[in-house]
Amino acid sequence: MKVASSLVGGRDPSPELAAEVVHNALQAAGVERADSVLLFLSRDYVRHAQPAIIAAARAAGTTQISGCTAYGLLNEQGWLLDQSGAVALVIAQSPAPATGDRREPLLSFSGHHTLPYDWQALPARAGLLDAEAVAWAHGRLAGTPGAEVRLPGMHARLASSPGLRLLGLPLTVTATTGYDLRQLGGLAAVDSLQRCLPAGLHAGAPHRP
């Protein structure tokens, strides 16, 4: 299996932007076509989603395009806010799933104000719920309750976060680069985090490169 992502920003919510982000992700994966694509578009694509989905499908060589619009986009390379953009995760050369294999993660995307009733029972899901989102699966805009897709050939275990936790007293921001935090209270941001973390969490904390 080969997997890679790409994040692209632009001036307008155009289909070309969706095609570009898929093309870049394919290049990063070292493949010419994908088995499936997770495609997320900025909020200004709400009225322009279907042409973008079609463009992404043509670029990927598959109709298995799933995702939704979102207020912010991110991948391992960076993030976008308040700007037209697209992010894609391409999955290629995925193995055929075993018959009845339900360990494949179930992703769900909905534009409802509340979690759809049919989604409140098992199986467990991961995804996005946004009252103003447009969602799609298998290359088409989804109706009620939203879009659902399983990622073929992937096995996953869902884990949930208990939420935010106060680590210490407020600290003065002493250095930034654009929107990136560099120093807190005179310490590098990562060193400040290490100092505030409980002892049991030090091993999993980020470290200075």
Task: Give residue ranges: language-model regions.
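Small-residue-enriched flexible segments
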Residues: 1-36, 40-46, 50, 55-57, ...
